[in-house]
Amino acid sequence: MDKRWSLQGMTALVTGAASGIGYAIVEELASFGAIIHICDISETLLSQSLSEWEKKGFQVSGSICDVASRPDREKLMQTVSSLFDGKLNILVNNVGVIRGKPTTEYVAEDFSYHISTNLEPAFHFSQLSHLLLKASGFGSIVFMSSATGVVSVQCGSIYSLTKGALNQLTRNLACEWAKDGIRANAVAPNVVKTPLSQSYLEDVGFKEALFSRTPLGRAGEPNEVASLVVFLCLPAASYITGQTICIDGGFTVNAFSYKPQA
């Protein structure tokens, strides 16, 4: 295989990876030959996922981690450093949460909940992994952003601002750490079929509104997002950095639909 299209022997950390998009990212990374460590807050899901990957012959290990806990994050990175001999090729800041409400209904706890899960861990994990990524000689960070961090949507302003902040962090790190051989990019999906989005997609009004604004007329699949994430980590993508790439069925470029009368 052309080495540009291989991750053979490269190491990766994926956060929140025992289900949903994170799970799909691990499967894709492993299929390209990466050696992966994941974290998740659910011991049950983690054990189940690790067992499934072992049966497939994937090289995946895992740790229980509450990413909202600074000590947990530091402990996780110590584990990763030990496992991978002080080097890391890929960091995927995937974990995220959402509480969809009108802005006037949010309370202080909602704000801290989103910041402490969606934004602070991604920033801190990037800090903690800097020396490991630099030591690898070929480092790549991918942030899981959202289409809502690119365009405005109703009932999710705090979630959206955390994703918009990740897009800016992507640009900052891409420029600041390029000299260290580290690239940084963000992936911004539309709604994707995962446990996190299930309740939204079961809402007929939400689903109709979303699909009418999405040219491809459907939600995304986890493996579709995973394909883009893994591409950005490949040597083939070595000149791509600082970008927020929407994977959204056309949602963010769609203005309005109008059919003139015949």
Swiss-Prot record:
Enzyme class, spelled out: oxidoreductase
GO molecular function: oxidoreductase activity
Positions with a binding annotation for substrate: S146
GO CC, any one term: peroxisome
Binding site for NADP(+): 13-37
SUPFAM superfamilies registered for this protein in UniProt: NAD(P)-binding Rossmann-fold domains (SSF51735)
Record key words, sorted: NADP, Oxidoreductase
Claim: Lyase is one of the keywords in the record: no
Entry EC number(s): 1.1.1.-
Positions of the catalytic residues: Y159
Taxonomic superkingdom: Eukaryota
Gene3D superfamilies: NAD(P)-binding Rossmann-like Domain
Key word Oxidoreductase present: yes
InterPro entries attached to this UniProt entry: NAD(P)-bd_dom_sf, SDR_fam, TR
Protein family per UniProt: Belongs to the short-chain dehydrogenases/reductases (SDR) family. SDR65C subfamily.
Protein name in the entry: Tropinone reductase homolog At2g29310
Organism: Arabidopsis thaliana
